[in-house]
A protein has these predicted regions:
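Acidic metal-coordinating catalytic centers involved in nucleic-acid phosphodiester chemistry
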Residues: 1-25, 73-257
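Catalytic centers of nucleases
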Residues: 17-26, 30-97
């Protein structure tokens, strides 16, 4: 029951987030834990799912890696879903971070191989609807002939250098991020492996509930209780330093609850 009290308090905080914006970092962490649980509930044979190892959440199987960067945003003024803009700082910060990770893997040949064995996914509760950049990325992934349009768009973003004193650190950072991405020699290969997914708090919670009910055969009336327990157990394990699971180790941990 302690876990239930703890997690219920957090879920109440999430529902009140528009009134208490100072809870932003906490809710962002809870969003990450929820997504971590979802990936654990859908783990496949041979996979290792981790938290804060290769990315916010990571999935590894053999040489293959999936980098999952989570960005949770709070709309403090309205209850509507926020839209991710083409120059959203979290978007370009994430792309820049992935570029930095790849560059650490060695020479260009090693980086190229790393990209080929990796998928890079930005998970956000901001909507990607009508985002031209994402639309162009998806079009390019389907047809290489669309690369030129995407390349021009990225190049244009990198040209928007802020004025020295007027635009502030945020715009300067966006400029640096866009420039680093644009200057990266293998950006064409990288963007072929980039995906953006929209996951609202409610949708993520519902996906977890469905996995618990229909995949784990838990009666509907017990689904919320099981979710509370799993979230509490995972949070406790993370505090103790357990941040990676295989399908076997997660099954063992869940069976002990």
């Amino acid at each position: 029951m302690g876990y239930r009290k703890y997690v219920t308090g957090i879920e109440i905080a999430m529902s009140k987030i528009n009134d208490y914006t100072a809870l932003g970092p906490l809710v962002g962490f809870v969003y990450q834990i929820y997504y971590f649980l979802y990936r654990l509930l859908t783990i496949q044979d041979g996979e290792t799912v981790s938290l804060e190892k290769i990315d916010d959440v990571g999935v590894e199987i053999g040489e293959k890696k999936t980098y999952l960067q989570l960005k949770h945003s709070i709309n403090s003024k309205h209850l509507t879903i926020k839209r991710m803009a083409e120059r959203d700082i979290n978007l370009w910060k994430t792309l820049n971070m992935w570029v930095c990770i790849i560059k650490k893997q060695g020479d260009e040949a090693a980086q190229r191989l790393w990209i080929a064995n990796s998928e890079f996914v930005l998970i956000s509760n901001k909507s990607a609807e009508n985002n031209r950049f994402f639309e162009m990325v998806e079009a390019y992934k389907k047809d290489d002939n669309n690369w030129e349009e995407l390349e021009k768009f990225v190049s244009k973003q990198a040209e928007k250098e802020p004025k020295e004193e007027c635009d502030g650190d945020k715009k300067k950072n966006i400029y640096l991020y866009t420039k680093n991405v644009n200057d990266y020699a293998l950006k064409k290969e990288l963007l072929k492996h980039v995906t953006v997914e929209f996951e609202s708090d409610d949708e993520l919670r519902e996906k977890i509930n469905r996995e618990i009910q229909y995949k784990k055969f838990v009666p509907e009336k017990r689904v919320s209780d099981v979710r509370y327990i799993l979230i509490g157990e995972i949070t406790d394990s993370v505090v103790k330093g357990v941040t990676s699971y295989t399908i076997e180790s997660f099954a063992e941990a869940a069976a002990a609850l």
